Amino acid sequence: ALPICCVIRPFNADDIEPFMAYRNDAEWMQYQGFKGLTKEAYAEALLGNASLTQGMQLAAIDTATGTLIGDLYLKQENDIIWLGYTVSPRYAGQGYALETAMAVIDWCKQQGFLAVKAGVVADNLPSINLLNKLGFSCSCTEDDEQIFVLNIQSAH
């Protein structure tokens, strides 16, 4: 098991500026949709009353420093959870995306969800490699995204 280096929690107002710093980095965010917004727009999206069925963004915080290292997007679709993840470029390649994704998968299992899905642009190789490492398999392509699925409940 990985050491627990971060905690996943709802966003608070202090997270908005560090969130903007990487979300508005056009090169780093080339594969992402939620980017390039104003502080007010991010605050409205991140600090509102989000729900799993509407989709919610959560902060990934380094437990040692309290620093925002990235974020997760979760959306419930019946008994499936859609997962999105972003790590700040300052923290990329250190296993944070793997750790947070594993934590979400464990939580989804405990909640009784049947599968986790993620959509990835075909040339986003780091993300595809992460999903493969987690045991996801590519099920289909929709628009310009490959849809990866991980079935998390073993059949009885």
Predicted regions and their residues:
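Acyl-donor (CoA/ACP) binding surface of acyl/acetyltransferases
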Residues: 1-27, 57-156
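Conserved GNAT-fold acetyl-CoA-binding loop/helix
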Residues: 27-47
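Short loop/turn motifs at secondary-structure junctions and domain boundaries
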Residues: 49-54
